[in-house]
Amino acid sequence: MSDVFDGYERQYCELSASLSKKCSSAISLDGEQKKQKLSEIKSGLENAEVLIRKMDLEARTLPPNLKSSLLVKLREFKSDLNNFKTEVKRITSGQLNAAARDELLEAGMADTKTASADQRARLMMSTERLGRTTDRVKDSRRTMMETEEIGVSILQDLHGQRQSLLRAHETLHGVDDNIGKSKKILTDMTRRMNKNKWTIGAIIIALIAAIFIILYFKLTK
């Protein structure tokens, strides 16, 4: 059910009960008092029409399963409003005799009692709906807070994991640097070893040549 529609309905029920009482009291009044009371009634009827239009607009924005039941209520409210308008016309016509006035007064009193009971029932239903809505809002708020706490915990865990990844990245970067340095050292050592091989080879060749020269001179003497 729409909370907005419920609010308009509650206002209309209160206004309807007030109009019923004013119509009943206007029957027994004369002169300026009657004019003042009729002015109040007409102002109330205008407010009632505004509320009905608002309820109609709100009902038509709702899903079909809700809209149908609310439109039935609206027809009842419109019929109730038309009855008030008819009664106001009869009161303002000035053609009521004493018997008719008494009859209308008694009918108005009966309608007031019936309307008051009906309004009380509707107000109680509206209050119960508001109570249930409040409970749902509290449950939703509690769920939202729990979800927020879980979200904060997840964010904290993600932050911790991010820090761990950053430290691991720094460690890997350091390892890469060490590997690069080690590779450079090995390259230098390999280059030196190759250089030493050539040097040793040259020395060996020189020694062999010297031996051959010595042997040659000894054999030729």
Swiss-Prot record:
Major subcellular location class: Golgi
GO biological process, one term: vesicle fusion
UniProt-reported outcome of changing G151D: In zig-3; retarded response to gravity
Bilayer-crossing regions: 199-219
Modified residues (N-acetylserine): S2
Tissues in which the protein is found: Expressed in roots, stems, flowers and leaves.
Coiled-coil blocks: 32-93
Topology term for the membrane: Single-pass type IV membrane protein
Record localization: Golgi apparatus, trans-Golgi network membrane; Prevacuolar compartment membrane; Vacuole membrane
Cytoplasmic compartment spans: 2-198
Null mutant phenotype: Abnormal amyloplast sedimentation and gravitropism in both inflorescence stems and hypocotyls with elongated stems in a zigzag fashion, due to narrower angles in internodes mediated by aberrant cell shapes. Reduced formation of vacuolar membrane 'bulbs'. Altered transport of proteins to the lytic vacuole. Small and wrinkled rosette leaves. Fragmentation and vesiculation of vacuoles mostly in cortex cells of the inflorescence stem in comparison to endodermal cells.
Vesicular topological segments: 220-221
Keywords in alphabetical order: Acetylation, Coiled coil, Golgi apparatus, Membrane, Protein transport, Transmembrane, Transmembrane helix, Transport, Vacuole
MF terms (GO), sorted A to Z: SNAP receptor activity
One annotated Gene Ontology cellular component of this protein: plastid
Pfam families: V-SNARE (PF05008), V-SNARE_C (PF12352)
Family of this protein: Belongs to the VTI1 family.
UniProt function note: Functions as a v-SNARE responsible for targeting AtELP-containing vesicles from the trans-Golgi network (TGN) to the prevacuolar compartment (PVC) and mediates liposome fusion. May be also involved in retrograde traffic to the cis-Golgi. Promotes the formation of vacuolar membrane 'bulbs'. Necessary to deliver proteins to the lytic vacuole, but seems not involved in storage proteins transport. Required for amyloplast sedimentation in the endodermis during shoot gravitropism, which are thus acting as statoliths.
Subunit structure: Forms SNARE complexes with the t-SNAREs SYP51 and either SYP21 or SYP22 in the PVC, and with a much lower affinity with SYP61 in the TGN. Does not interact with SYP41, SYP42 or VPS45. Binds to EPSIN1. Interacts with SCYL2B.
Descriptive protein name: Vesicle transport v-SNARE 11
Annotated source species: Arabidopsis thaliana
Lineage: Eukaryota, Viridiplantae, Streptophyta, Embryophyta, Tracheophyta
